[in-house]
């Protein structure tokens, strides 16, 4: 052992000594000896059109996640409304299939499934009001807001079209003819207020419900407030929407989401429901299910960030910090 220890520690000038062979344990191979002279084969290049398709797919991936999220929301929500209401006609079904609670569950499941599909890709907004609130309070890029909203509205159009195609024969029977289309079936896709509701009451109902929704979304995504894991967030939103529908859903059919109302309403206009969709109650479609939710989401985010948020991801927090730094500078 002592002789070996001396050999490994004392270098030798002879390149064939034992020390040199221990350092270079791997013998030379023909491949390694000619590595400098042989050219490595190049990886096969993809066709240009495939590269372009991949670039396009990458560019539209997040908006497409919002598109599919809203489409799923409408399929579950409007689909449940169609089943419950259309089945009340004895010529459509032998008995009623569900109740108002069934519709609440349908919309809640639609929210959960939509967020599950899109959450890990686009953030799972699936609501223009939430997208704008995230841009205002959470640093979501304003340049992405138009593409998100467009995708959300188109998702509403396609989701409504799929549900309509599925129930078209039941709608014909319910309406009493193939070319008869009235508010009775339009309300299965778009939102309509109860007759006794005033304009101000309709606006307030949508504003209040969306403010609660926005505040809860901010709470559920606040890492400093015992937020659920990403996998449990859709389930939490499911519970939230069941509660919103059960408590604030009767009077205006709780749109809470401009894309959920405007997308299906656009499809209904193309399906032959006429101008009455947009003339109803002095442009109800604009100020109740669009403007009120957008403002309600802003109010909910403002309340949460003003009184509850303790992170650095809010503009309100930044302004407070700036004012404190300015006061300290003045004291010094």
UniProtKB/Swiss-Prot annotation:
Induction text: Expression is up-regulated during development of the basidiocarp.
Keyword Transport: yes
Transmembrane segments: 67-87, 101-121, 145-165, 200-220, 231-251, 284-304
Motif residue range(s): NPA 1: 127-129
Positions in the Cytoplasmic compartment: 1-66, 122-144, 221-230, 305-332
Keywords for the protein's UniProt record, in alphabetical order: Membrane, Repeat, Transmembrane, Transmembrane helix, Transport
Organism domain of life: Eukaryota
Presence of keyword Transit peptide: no
Cellular component terms (Gene Ontology): plasma membrane
Places the protein is found: Membrane
Family, as annotated: Belongs to the MIP/aquaporin (TC 1.A.8) family.
NCBIfam families the UniProt entry points to: MIP (TIGR00861)
Record's comment describing the protein's domains: Aquaporins contain two tandem repeats each containing three membrane-spanning domains and a pore-forming loop with the signature motif Asn-Pro-Ala (NPA).
UniProt protein name: Aquaporin-7-2
Organism: Laccaria bicolor
